[in-house]
Amino acid sequence: GLPAGTGELQSETGRIYRFIEQDAPDWSDRQTDFSPTQIKNYPVQGLATGDIVPMMLGVLFDNFYGDPDVLLINTVHDSILFDVSDDVNHKEVARKIKTIMEQAPDYFNSRFNPKIKFDLPLKAEVQWGKSWGQMTETL
């Protein structure tokens, strides 16, 4: 096979991405199983799900900590899931979550500026329903 290569990329926020180019068998026409374009997406996707979402989870946690009616329960990629009691105004909770999430650029800049300037607006979408399959309303 072909010799393996390794490399790494450090994002502006300090996150280190390591990648490995595996040996390819001789019969594979001297191709490797790693495409250099794969690493190009790491900083973009990593900024969203590796930096911004965890930062904002902390802000959301601080805002809802101790509230038994609003429980932060999970994340899936860039989605954040809450379990909200039927006893509270869901629209009010949704607006609060949306407002907090749309402040992500300000929060990000307060932590990383002047090293990194995040000057793009982020729009957050909030949906709710009894289950994922029943989510219909959007803010």
Model-predicted segments: where are they?
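Conserved catalytic core of nucleotide polymerization and phosphodiester-bond processing enzymes
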Residues: 1-139
